[in-house]
């Protein structure tokens, strides 16, 4: 069993005319969001890991270790460590390593491609389906369901945190709950400190569309 902590904050955009709060639509995303995940230490990491998602124009401050001459772009990934950081554009393109005490990005050389064949991971996926569950082709997948399932769970928990921040304190109240740290028990698939947030984790399917899992 592993637990996660998630919290999110989103803006309320006022009308320019009279500065009355804009309506909130459950069917659409907020104009921007800031989501923080906290992962407890585990067998593969001996300390807490914090991951932050930003969108809608929100950006982190320019790290001091990266000089003002280096462009870090508008979208991307920033991994901060004790002795340096790794920056890349979106989808991990053009990754660069910066180490404290060294000027500029560190040259790490070209990394060789793995199984560089046409339609690489797509072909591996088809081969695994043909070979069947538990086959060598299945075990060798670089992104099988054992990995992709928890990854999707993490992303969707961020959406649950965003939607939870837009819950009102009571049916008659105009005050929103706002940012609240949610405690998640993945084994039970349950948010343990805000029961109303659990409505965003599952849904009631129409007759004939049940998943039966």
Would you name each region that the model predicts?
Residues 3-133, 141-144, 150-200, 204-213:
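Glycine-rich, aromatic-lined ligand/substrate-binding cores of catalytic
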């Amino acid at each position: 069993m592993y637990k996660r902590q998630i919290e999110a904050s989103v803006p309320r955009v006022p009308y320019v005319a009279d500065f009355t709060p804009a309506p909130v639509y459950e069917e659409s995303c907020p104009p921007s969001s800031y989501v923080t995940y906290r992962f407890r230490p585990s067998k593969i990491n001996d300390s807490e890991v914090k991951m932050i998602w930003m969108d809608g124009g929100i950006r982190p401050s320019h790290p001091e270790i990266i000089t003002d001459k280096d462009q870090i772009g508008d979208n991307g990934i920033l991994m901060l460590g004790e002795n340096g950081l790794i920056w890349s554009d979106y989808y991990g393109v053009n990754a660069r390593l910066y180490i404290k005490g060294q000027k500029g990005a560190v040259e790490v050389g070209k990394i060789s491609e793995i199984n560089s064949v046409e339609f690489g991971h797509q072909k591996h996926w088809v081969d695994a389906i043909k070979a069947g569950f538990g086959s060598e082709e299945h075990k060798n997948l670089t992104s099988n369901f054992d990995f992709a399932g928890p990854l999707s769970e993490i992303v969707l928990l961020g959406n649950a945190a965003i939607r939870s921040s837009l819950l009102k304190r009571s049916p008659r109240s105009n005050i929103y709950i706002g940012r609240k740290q949610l405690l998640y028990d993945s084994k039970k698939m349950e948010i343990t400190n805000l029961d109303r947030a659990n409505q965003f984790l599952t849904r009631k399917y129409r007759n004939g569309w049940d998943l039966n899992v």
